[in-house]
């Protein structure tokens, strides 16, 4: 999968802040498992899941890539298209959190 394919899938999950993000976290965990990356999924607040993945050797140092998957509700916003479907218009991509965390997560996963 390329970055745009991953982003399209991530945006399709309705991870509105007061709802669960479990299915999205499981999707990412399964995606990483294809590359032999071990993950841990654990629940923070009820219905809100965190995913921990570690790549590389057990040595001092390293880097942490951290993000969030929740989005604010779209009610009352003037979306012309479905905010949970990635749309390309004039060489730009539109979708809920396409340029925020879901975009970042797609780049990291690609």
Describe every region a protein language model picked out.
Residues 1-98:
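Acidic/His- and Gly-rich active-site-bordering loop/insert found
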Residues 97-110:
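Active-site alpha-helical elements of protease catalytic centers
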């Amino acid at each position: 999968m390329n970055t745009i394919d991953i982003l399209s899938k991530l945006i399709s999950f309705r991870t509105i802040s007061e709802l669960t993000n479990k299915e999205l976290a499981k999707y990412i965990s399964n995606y990483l498992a294809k590359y032999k990356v071990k993950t841990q999924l654990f629940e923070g607040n009820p219905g809100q899941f965190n995913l921990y993945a570690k790549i590389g050797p057990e040595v001092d140092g390293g880097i942490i890539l951290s993000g969030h998957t929740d989005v604010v509700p779209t009610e009352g916003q003037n979306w012309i298209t479905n905010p949970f479907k990635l749309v390309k218009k004039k060489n730009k991509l539109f979708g809920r959190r396409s340029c925020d965390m879901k975009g970042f997560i797609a780049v990291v996963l690609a």
